[in-house]
A protein has these predicted regions:
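Single conserved hydrophobic/aromatic residue that forms the stacking wall/gate
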Residues: 2-13
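Acidic, carboxylate-rich catalytic segments that either coordinate divalent cations
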Residues: 30-31, 39, 44-53, 57, ...
C-alpha cells in the first residue's frame, strides 16, 4: 500500500495541473479567444491532446460539485497575487478555463450535477508566482494533506475500511 501511495504522490501534482496549464499556454495561441480555449479543452476531454487521458485537471471534486469552498477563498488571494506579480494574462486564462471546462464536461461526459475548480486548480500557479522551485510542488502538496490523510486512515481502521466523505455524519457508537 505504501508503494502505491508514494508512487502516486510522486506523479500527482507537477504532472497534472501545471503541465496541463503549460500545454495549454503553448498550444492555445489566443488565450482570450473563448472558442479557441473551448476547442482545445474539448480535444483534451476527447483524449487527443496533452496526456491523452481525457481529463481537465483541477476540475471536479468527489464531494463538492457546485463549488469547492476552499477554492473560492483561495482564488481571491490568487487574483491579488497575480495582479501584484503582473500575471493578469495568466489569471485570465485560468478564469477562462474555469468558465468553459464545466460546460464542456457537462456536454461531453453528461455530468449535470455541476463541476467546478477544486483547490488544486490554482496551487501550482501560486507556487510559480512565489518563485518556488517545481521540485518542491509535490512535497508542498503532500504537506498540506498529511494531517487529513492521517485522520482519514485512522477513521478507515476504526470504521472497517468504509469510505468516509466530509458531508457524512458518523452513526457509529463511540469507542471507549
Amino acid at each position: 500500500r505504501d508503494y502505491y501511495a508514494s508512487r502516486g504522490l510522486g506523479d500527482v501534482y507537477k504532472r497534472q495541473v501545471m503541465q496541463m496549464m503549460n500545454d495549454i499556454r503553448e498550444n492555445v495561441h489566443d488565450w482570450s479567444d473563448r472558442d479557441e480555449v473551448k476547442s482545445y479543452l474539448g480535444k483534451m476531454l476527447d483524449g487527443q491532446v496533452f496526456d491523452k487521458k481525457g481529463l481537465i485537471y483541477g476540475m471536479g471534486h468527489a464531494v463538492y460539485s457546485l463549488s469547492d469552498p476552499r477554492e473560492r477563498v483561495f482564488r481571491s488571494y490568487v487574483e491579488h497575487l497575480a495582479e501584484a506579480k503582473g500575471r493578469q494574462k495568466d489569471m485570465n486564462l485560468y478564469n477562462m478555463i474555469e468558465e468553459v471546462a464545466p460546460e464542456l464536461i457537462a456536454e461531453k461526459r453528461h455530468i449535470f450535477k455541476g463541476v467546478s475548480p477544486n483547490v488544486d486548480f490554482y496551487s501550482g500557479f501560486v507556487y510559480e508566482m512565489l518563485g518556488i522551485p517545481s521540485e518542491l510542488y509535490t512535497p508542498l502538496f503532500a504537506i498540506a494533506r498529511i494531517a487529513g490523510w492521517s485522520a482519514h486512515r485512522l477513521e478507515e481502521l476504526v470504521g472497517c475500511n468504509k469510505i468516509i466523505r466530509p458531508a457524512y455524519k458518523s452513526v457509529m457508537e463511540e469507542l471507549e
